[in-house]
């Protein structure tokens, strides 16, 4: 009895070592694609008519040539996926060490909100049973907004300072990369232009009485500019060794 338990323990550990922790969905997707391709191939072969003997001959030749190679390397893709999975695990561990605890708590709250989705779905289902599609849509929108707005504002207030700090730091780092300043000269003004157009469109539709516009967030362009100015990290581009601030 003790010997059988001792044998089962190494097998269990070996099975856990062979199990993917983060990229198992890739393996499942690959198996699904292979099954679909095999089914499609079998269907095409069965309906190939007079070409079926030729297809079977080619299939036998391919199996003869590829078979030994497959037997030798069939486990390589999984081992490569396992290697990447372990790297992802190490990266997540390092990220958890460096991410501020404030962000972790906010992330937990976001997960809690996501877990409440089934309750909201039940409320929506019961609401749809009432007559009037337009009234139902309005009630659903108000219900979602009233339930999510407090949590969203709380998460935003916690994430904003951390996100602003990392944004300034990331801009400083990116601005040192070759060719990035030249790309920024094109991208930043374009992004600012379309952000302003978006804000104008949302404001216009809200003034015209469209309900959906009341729930669309505006892009805080002025706040973004102020963050970079306060951090002494106004987006700049380097030309001839001189850093020139980009126009707002």
From Swiss-Prot:
Disulfide bond residue pairs: none
InterPro entries named among the record's database cross-references: REF (IPR008802)
Coiled coil: none
Keyword vocabulary terms for this entry: Stress response
Species of origin: Vitis riparia
Expression induction or repression: By cold stress.
UniProt-recorded name of the protein: Stress-related protein
Record flagged with keyword Cell inner membrane: no
Domain of life: Eukaryota
Gene: SRP
Family note: Belongs to the REF/SRPP family.
């Amino acid at each position: 009895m003790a010997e059988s338990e001792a044998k089962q323990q190494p097998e269990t550990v070996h099975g856990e070592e062979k199990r993917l922790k983060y990229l198992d969905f890739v393996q499942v997707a690959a198996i699904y694609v292979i099954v679909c391709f095999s089914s499609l191939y079998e269907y095409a072969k069965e309906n190939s008519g007079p070409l079926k003997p030729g297809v079977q001959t080619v299939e036998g030749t391919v199996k003869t040539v590829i078979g030994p190679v497959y037997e030798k390397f069939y486990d390589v893709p999984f081992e490569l996926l396992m290697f990447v999975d372990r790297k992802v695990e190490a990266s997540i561990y390092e990220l958890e060490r460096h991410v501020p605890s404030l962000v972790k708590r906010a992330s937990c709250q976001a997960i809690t909100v996501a877990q409440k989705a089934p309750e909201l779905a039940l409320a929506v289902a019961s609401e749809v049973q009432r007559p009037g599609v337009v009234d139902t849509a309005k009630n659903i929108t108000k219900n979602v907004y009233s339930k999510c707005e407090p949590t969203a504002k709380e998460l935003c207030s916690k994430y904003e300072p951390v996100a602003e700090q990392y944004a300034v730091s990331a801009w400083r780092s990116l601005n040192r990369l070759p060719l990035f300043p030249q790309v920024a000269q094109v991208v930043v003004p374009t992004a600012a232009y379309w952000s302003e157009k978006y804000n104008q469109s949302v404001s216009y539709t809200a003034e015209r009485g469209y309900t959906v516009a009341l729930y669309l967030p505006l892009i805080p362009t002025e706040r973004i500019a102020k963050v970079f100015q306060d951090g002494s990290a106004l987006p700049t581009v380097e030309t001839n060794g001189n850093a020139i601030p980009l126009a707002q």
